[in-house]
Structure formats: structure tokens, C-alpha cells
């Protein structure tokens, strides 16, 4: 069976500001680099045979800080890029809620079928993510592989693994920056072994991970 370690990138300034960050090529903050460094220490003894990464800077920086310790080069895959937030890209969530609350609430209630204005739906994103997972399982039927990506990508991957509706990913799955999730492939399908493990972040102090705000009353972070 193959073991796949799904990593959400370290924190960025936009994450800390609760700003919609999809395809913008935002780097890690200093706190995010430290998160990636302590995560690398945790993972360095795992016999990884490959590291895959989104080409976006925040994910690639995270992947490189880990792969430097194990002597591997990240393999870039466009299917791992974050959801396209369209017209909301770069905007503060508070501003979107103030200026277009009806559109945001409709999307938030069913982010699989609906897309941000000019952006990508959860179903469209999940199709490329499932394609990546299928190719990954075929390429690495045994062994250990690291995958560094983004919040929505990882949550939609977990929805697929669990057979859960992608419409539920924002409502039911909380995923912090630099969190570790582990899935494994079996002949009969996928298993979730670990989800949103941030125990390694205790080394960088409280508040290192991005907060996840409550659903509905105060909208979830992007």
C-alpha cells in the first residue's frame, strides 16, 4: 500500500489577514517558514521516495524546506494549485461579506456546485485533484510520498477519500496551516489515517496556525 502525506503550506500574510488567496503567488511569512522548518524536522526520518508540490510559491517554499533535509527535489504538478477565487481573489473576507453577502452565503452553502464570481467550483477543482490522486496511486503503489498543496485542495482530497460530498468541505473539515494529513491507498480504495495533525507546531508557540472561524454566524476563513 502507498502512504501519502498531505501537507497544507505554512502560513502567509494573506492567511493571517483572512484575505482570499487562490492563484496569487504569495510567499510564506516568517512564521510560515518556521512552521515548515519544524514540520521538516518531524518528517525527515520518513523514507520518502518523492515530493510533489503545487507550483505556487507558498507551497513550493514549504516543499523545498522539507525536501532539502531528505535530498529530494519537489515535482511540480499544476493539479495541486489552489481553488480559483475569481473576482474575490486578494480581497478581505470582511469586505466580501459587507459588499456582496448574498453571493458569498450562497457559495458558502454549496461550494461544490457554485463558484466565486469568475472563479472555480469545488467540483471542477475536485476533478483535477482526483486525477492527481489516481495517478499518484498508480505511480507509487508502495512506499511513502509527500504532497504539499493548499487548504481547499487537501480538503477536497479528503472528501474523495471518505466518500463525503464535496459540498461539505468548508462546513465540516477544518485544516490549519502546516497541518499533516495521511492517506493510504488499498486495492479496494482509500483510507484516511490522520487529519489536521499540528502537534509539531507546539514548537513555534501558540497562534502559529490560521484560525478557522465558525460557520454561518461568522464566516469560515477562505
Q: Where would I find each of the regions flagged by the language model?
A:
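Phosphate-coordination/substrate-recognition cap region in phosphate-metabolizing enzymes
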Residues: 38-104, 221
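Short active-site segment of divalent metal-dependent hydrolases/proteases
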Residues: 12, 153-154
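Acidic, low-complexity terminal tails and accessory targeting/binding regions
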Residues: 2, 72, 86-97, 138, ...
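Active-site signature of alpha/beta-hydrolase-fold catalytic machinery across serine-
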Residues: 65, 156-160
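Short glycine/proline- and acidic residue-enriched helix-loop micro-motifs
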Residues: 103-124, 221
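Surface-exposed helix-capping loop/turn segments at secondary-structure junctions
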Residues: 45-49, 138-145
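Loop-to-helix element that buttresses phosphate recognition and phosphoryl-transfer chemistry
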Residues: 5-66, 115-130
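Short basic (Lys/Arg) and small-residue
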Residues: 150
Amino acid at each position: 500500500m502507498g502512504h501519502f502525506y498531505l501537507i497544507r503550506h505554512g502560513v502567509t500574510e494573506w492567511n493571517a489577514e483572512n484575505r482570499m488567496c487562490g492563484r496569487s503567488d504569495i510567499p510564506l511569512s516568517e512564521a510560515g517558514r518556521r512552521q515548515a522548518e519544524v514540520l521538516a524536522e518531524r518528517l525527515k526520518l520518513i523514507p520518502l521516495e518523492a515530493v510533489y508540490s503545487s507550483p505556487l510559491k507558498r507551497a513550493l517554499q514549504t516543499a523545498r524546506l522539507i525536501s532539502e533535509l531528505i535530498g529530494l527535489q519537489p515535482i511540480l504538478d499544476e493539479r495541486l494549485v489552489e481553488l480559483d477565487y475569481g473576482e474575490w481573489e486578494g480581497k478581505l473576507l470582511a469586505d466580501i461579506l459587507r459588499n456582496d453577502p448574498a453571493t458569498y452565503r450562497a457559495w458558502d452553502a454549496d461550494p461544490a456546485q457554485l463558484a466565486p464570481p469568475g472563479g472555480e467550483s469545488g467540483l471542477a477543482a475536485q476533478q483535477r485533484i482526483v486525477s492527481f490522486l489516481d495517478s499518484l496511486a498508480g505511480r507509487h503503489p508502495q512506499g511513502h510520498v509527500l504532497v504539499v498543496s493548499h487548504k481547499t485542495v487537501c480538503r477536497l482530497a479528503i472528501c474523495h477519500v471518505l466518500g463525503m460530498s464535496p459540498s461539505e468541505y468548508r462546513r465540516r473539515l477544518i485544516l490549519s496551516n502546516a497541518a499533516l494529513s495521511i492517506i493510504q491507498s488499498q486495492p479496494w480504495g482509500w483510507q484516511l489515517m490522520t487529519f489536521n495533525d499540528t502537534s509539531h507546531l507546539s514548537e513555534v508557540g501558540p497562534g502559529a496556525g490560521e484560525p478557522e472561524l465558525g460557520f454561518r454566524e461568522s464566516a469560515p476563513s477562505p
